[in-house]
């Protein structure tokens, strides 16, 4: 959520930043009008409450002096009714103001390139050379079905479209990738966590999924809980409504969880294989940083994600998302895209973002530089490290052999119990 003080002091700056996201900037004027109205109503109620208190003292004094206080009592009742009326109006104005504020995205960083959509994202790095096959390469969904590593048909019977059973060596490869990713991040200083995979609405609000993106979520109506779309949600909310001490920063968490997404609006896209699922496993990184350190932390986090693909020796590229493609809560984002031969293209496998104080303001996560200092908002960051299913697909496609087998990447052999080939 954006700071209302920024609207008051730098409205043109806010308009400029929102315009970069193609958002109608008249919302800034609407928010300022509501803010002025709310402050005027607040001032009026404070005046009336002061008047009521003074009148109450007068009534008490009259009663002590055995004087008639009827007029003062009547006046105090009228003031009380006026306070109730104004409080009702203030609550309505304040709620309208909040509703508008919480639906506005973060302001993009000066380092975020300007652009209208994904076609204007900027490539900042490319690593590795896509493999040239001397045979007809197959898509991962065909390879894994031939090797009995996955069963999409039975998953559709059990759950519906966009689900998969991973079986035999498929299940083993998935687990190997999870453990390899977690071990890599632990070596990079991240604390491993096991998180809840059902969270409440306050948690979803804190990280920005609610209220704007509710249609993308699965909800357990009876309990009022949501399945997590990413472990960013529980990891970030771990410190919700808390004040951290200076020595707690930076804090770096990593977790592997199942993630659940309705994929609203993606009908017809990536309908085969493991690329776009309702349920998938993902290793996540989350960081809590001092504001002055958060952009350097983003570079470091992105390197952690990239290092997974480098150790697997799979080509990738890193792009800086432009202002028209960047996520709702992010100020700056890098997407890491892995090479998938079946698409003859790079596909997103990680998104690493600096959310600055956007989530921290919603979730009320603060820190103190020393015990006597004023509490400040932390900066939060999150990044995939990596999406396990997409990494699985990338390994299968990039390490496929002409006879239909898959060579196990060298770094995964210990995690596969010494197995070097899946056949």
UniProtKB/Swiss-Prot annotation:
GO CC aspect terms: cytoplasm
Residues that bind L-serine: 230-232, 284, 384
Entry keywords, A to Z: Aminoacyl-tRNA synthetase, ATP-binding, Cytoplasm, Ligase, Nucleotide-binding, Protein biosynthesis
InterPro entries reported for this sequence: aa-tRNA-synt_IIb, aa-tRNA-synth_II, aa-tRNA-synth_II/BPL/LPL, Ser-tRNA-ligase_type_1, Ser-tRNA-synth_1_N, SerRS_1_N_sf, SerRS_core, tRNA-bd_arm
Catalytic activity: tRNA(Ser) + L-serine + ATP = L-seryl-tRNA(Ser) + AMP + diphosphate + H(+); tRNA(Sec) + L-serine + ATP = L-seryl-tRNA(Sec) + AMP + diphosphate + H(+)
Pathway participation: Aminoacyl-tRNA biosynthesis; selenocysteinyl-tRNA(Sec) biosynthesis; L-seryl-tRNA(Sec) from L-serine and tRNA(Sec): step 1/1
EC code(s) of this entry: 6.1.1.11
Sequence positions that bind ATP: 261-263, 348-351
Enzyme class, UniProt record, top EC level: ligase
Keyword Oxidoreductase attributed: no
GO molecular function: ATP binding; catalytic activity, acting on a protein; serine-tRNA ligase activity; transferase activity
Record localization: Cytoplasm
Family: Belongs to the class-II aminoacyl-tRNA synthetase family. Type-1 seryl-tRNA synthetase subfamily.
UniProt remark on domains: Consists of two distinct domains, a catalytic core and a N-terminal extension that is involved in tRNA binding.
Assembly and binders: Homodimer. The tRNA molecule binds across the dimer.
PANTHER family the record matches: SERINE--TRNA LIGASE, SERYL-TRNA SYNTHETASE
HAMAP family on file: Ser_tRNA_synth_type1 (MF_00176)
Protein name per UniProt: Serine--tRNA ligase
Source organism of the structure: Macrococcus caseolyticus (strain JCSC5402)
